[in-house]
Amino acid sequence: MKCNTLKLTEQDQFINKIKNSESQITSFYEYDAAKKESFYRRLKTPNNGREFHLSRVIKSYMNELKLTHQQLNNIDALADGAKVVIGGQQAGLFGGPLYTFHKIFSIITLSRQLSEEYDTPIVPVFWIAGEDHDFEEVNHTYAFNNKETTLKKVKYHTMTPPDSNVSRYTPDKNELKASLNHFFKEMKETVHTQDVYQMCVNIINQFDSWTDIFKGLIHEVFKDYGILFIDAQYPELRQMEKPLFKEILEKRNQIDQSFRETQIRKTQQQLPSMIQTETNTHLFIHEDGMRQLLNFDGTYFKLNKTEKRYTKQNLLDIIEREPERISNNVVTRPVVEEWLFNTVAFIGGPSEIKYWAELKDVFDTLNVEMPIVMPRLRITYLYARTKKLLKQYNLSIESVIANGVEQERQHFVREKASNNFINEVEEMKIQQQELYNNLFTYVENNHDNQLLLEKNNQIHLNQYDYLIKRYLLNIERENDISMRQFREISETLHPMGGLQERVWNPLQIMNDFGIDVFSPTTYPPLSYSFDHLIINP
């Protein structure tokens, strides 16, 4: 496998501005992610003293997995005070989109590079966002169907979707296997299909909760890199978080004010606000089988789905006795994560790093220093067949990844069409308009007849447009093979108008190139980059 760097012309320049250390962006973070001195300074910060306890919690969470010696060594290193590189993601169906794996690779790559450069152990940690309750975001994925050269949606179906955290949700294993069968039915069968399929079946059989099944998959793929996992909703972790939950509750007004004032400053810098929330408490509680947002009305903390209300003391008592019932929203989650870990760098997706830019003052309010915030690696897999098609149609990979192929496809069709035919039809439209302009002179004093002529004229003009459209459609049908190839290029490199990694599932890559395609022995060694990476499997 080979890896190359690609510089894309992107409409969104946020990451490029981080790369270029532009103050418009860097002023919203504690550290400049593009400067080497930031890492040196961050590594010198004292530890928080929670590392040993945290290592025991992580070991407990990963206890049902068969840990590799790399993972055991990293748990020991964490206990001894090693700092971490961390990032997280929701638990998507069958691993979710490729960018989940790419975030894990980002964490692994940066931790390895920092370990080597500073001659000190840096532990890679992946945070599973098990407290999330938006099941519609994680219950589906896509498979590329080669025969139809199109992506097919594959969904886990249930009549009773969870109202609470996905960590609390136990899916029906038969339905999950039915979704898995659907996924593999859409893909072409290869010499690797049975191995990948059986791996997934074994994981579904072994684990019960939605996030544990996800954990089992990413562990199987990434265990040899030594990466550690933790679920945000893990009860032992919630026990550790009790002091900070209480502080968040006590400082809710300052937190809310800090967050909203930063959003205003960000808007004044012509940067759009990312976080949309009406709560002033920034915590959820598990109540009546649902994850419900708390909001303070001046007297009581009320819920967004039921009529129940709490005093501050009620909530402090719940935090003390049942902290697993409390969870964070988008404003407080990053602070809790960094309060727990001695983090060198947080790895986020493009949207994540934007909303972190709204939270620096929230970190300061809770006396937690924001770590270095780094954009994750962005990766596209270029199949040999796709590369051949790009050459066949003289397409640049940079342009296709950024913009798709629709313009080039239309140009191809027009090249195959008769310009004389199209020009004649366009000339007929002009003559038609001239004729009706003359007719208008005879009815200029009759409004009803003017409307009649306008309507009739438009009908005829629409017919000429329809004639050209159907003519070009017939040209497309005559060149069906080329149209399928353009669609294949688009669905592979620019699916749904975006990046491959936002749509394609990692199991597709494993099915095509082997169950060990993401392993250290097969995957190309990566170097951290702000640019786009192209991997040729």
Swiss-Prot record:
InterPro entries listed in its UniProt record = Bacillithiol_biosynth_BshC, CC_BshC, Rossmann-like_BshC
| Keyword Metal-binding among UniProt keywords | no
Among Pfam families, the record links this protein to: CC_BshC, Rossmann-like_BshC
Organism's domain of life? Bacteria
Record keywords, A-Z = Coiled coil, Ligase
Q: From the UniProt record, list the coiled-coil ranges.
A: 415-439
EC assignment: the record states 6.-.-.-
- UniProt keyword Ligase, yes or no: yes
The record's GO molecular-function terms, alphabetically, read:
ligase activity
Give the protein's biological function: Involved in bacillithiol (BSH) biosynthesis. May catalyze the last step of the pathway, the addition of cysteine to glucosamine malate (GlcN-Mal) to generate BSH.
The similarity annotation says: Belongs to the BshC family.
HAMAP family linked to this entry? BshC (MF_01867)
Q: What is the name listed in the Swiss-Prot or TrEMBL entry for this protein?
A: Putative cysteine ligase BshC
Report the source organism. Answer: Staphylococcus epidermidis (strain ATCC 12228 / FDA PCI 1200)
